[in-house]
Amino acid sequence: MTVVPVALVAGGSRGLGLEIARQLHRCGHHVALCARDEAALQRAASEFKERVSIHVMDVTDREGVQRVVKEILNGYGPIEVAIHVAGIIQVGPAADVELEHFDQALDIMAKGPINVAWSVLPSMRERRRGHIGVVASVGGVVSPPHLLPYSTAKFAALGFTDGLAAELMGTGVTATSIVPGLMRTGSHDQATFIGNATAEHNWFSVAASAPLISANSTRAARRMVDGVLAGKPLVTITPLAWMAYRVRGLMPGITTRAMGISNRFLPRATGNTVPVKGSKLSVSPVVRRLTHWSRCAAARNNEV
């Protein structure tokens, strides 16, 4: 009997996580989709005719993650691949950011990868086989303005995965840091915005949709999965991410000053600290036209 390899995707119900799940399924894996929203999981799973299971899981709940991993191991067999994609995007000036925004970002995008990795590692080490992938971001290499909680968490995720990869060398288990730039996944409407929420949503959604600076999410997901399965320690997606790595390493001071200059062109703080979801904001006809490709991606990737 042919053994079907199992892949766990944390944050696999929508957006980039769903794109990664599709690529793993294409490679012949049974895909265990994990996310908090059961309805979103059911919608995502409906496009797969076989080799799929859904698991309600919150990556911030350590015991819950361990319980789901045990459920997958007992029900479907050894987990060969585990990729952490779950995330939250909070956009707004630092003056309007509250400490709880950092807590939310760190719990999901810094502690989440640790919870997933520490739950799958024992069985992977025992078999001396397995691949762990963590989706970080170019925001974990260069900290752009108005994304401070997000970048703080992504820097932490990148440091964790880089160190884990070094310690796993020679064990048969690999860890891959995935560093994408902007991608057209449709996630801008799932992001939350503080300060001048409409103005923040406008610049962010247009940037995430622009073909010249954002990547096609399907092609990006394919490269990510290929890199994780190959056991590469680092996979950079998009020229922007590649350039950020090199420029930040060679000229850190200049990079920070460049970010400071770009901050001058972004909306000012207003004192509004209450996050507003992007999908709740009205947008102008011009912005709708400029975000056409991202809205198409949102429909395809269950970003509803």
Regions found by a protein language model. Give the residues of each.
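Conserved glycine-rich cofactor-binding loop
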Residues: 13-14
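Conserved glycine-rich Rossmann-like NAD(P)H-binding loop of the short-chain dehydrogenase/reductase
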Residues: 27-43
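The beta1-alpha1 cofactor-binding region of Rossmann-like NAD(H)/NADP(H)-dependent oxidoreductases
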Residues: 56-67, 99
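Substrate-binding pocket helix/loop in short-chain dehydrogenase/reductase
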Residues: 93-94, 101-106
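Active-site helix of classical SDR
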Residues: 117, 153
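Residue(s) in the substrate-gating loop at a strand-loop-helix junction
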Residues: 137
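SDR active-site lid
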Residues: 170-241, 256-257
